[in-house]
């Protein structure tokens, strides 16, 4: 007998880091679990997360997420002292951890958080190995995106 999928109201995406895709070229993506406290889970369910300026560092053979803000709910966090920008441990396989650490130890590479989402009942973070873009690369991306929009507009008007 197959297992029923849990009903998820709305989107499974909690937060996205759109700036990371603009400022970095993403080479490879990984999915990581998060070690959270109870009030953080309730805040994530309410969509109170922000991933801008968040990145991953490695200490003592473990990965930690820095700079991610989870705003506490007044109802859920009245009896605990909440730190919205605390460092959160990431759950990765040993092979993934070694791969990420090897890439980051090279020059110019960093690991940034791209998005946070629900996978069944678990909150996950999509992290990416990234290399910083130069200004001219950013301008080229903007030109390419605008040309795609113009091309779609021209094709739409040509079909009429």
UniProtKB/Swiss-Prot annotation:
This one is known as SsrA-binding protein
| GO molecular function terms attached to this record | RNA binding
**What is the protein's known function?**
Required for rescue of stalled ribosomes mediated by trans-translation. Binds to transfer-messenger RNA (tmRNA), required for stable association of tmRNA with ribosomes. tmRNA and SmpB together mimic tRNA shape, replacing the anticodon stem-loop with SmpB. tmRNA is encoded by the ssrA gene; the 2 termini fold to resemble tRNA(Ala) and it encodes a 'tag peptide', a short internal open reading frame. During trans-translation Ala-aminoacylated tmRNA acts like a tRNA, entering the A-site of stalled ribosomes, displacing the stalled mRNA.
Q: Name one GO cellular component term.
A: cytosol
Q: Does Transport appear among the keywords?
A: no
* Keyword Cell membrane in record: no
Q: What gene is behind this protein?
A: smpB
Protein family: Belongs to the SmpB family.
Major localization class: cytoplasm
Among Pfam families, the record links this protein to: SmpB (PF01668)
Tell me which UniProt keywords the record has, alphabetically.
Cytoplasm, RNA-binding
Q: Give the GO terms filed under biological process for this record.
A: trans-translation
Instruction: Cite the NCBIfam families for this sequence.
Output: PRK05422.1, smpB
Localized where?
Answer: Cytoplasm
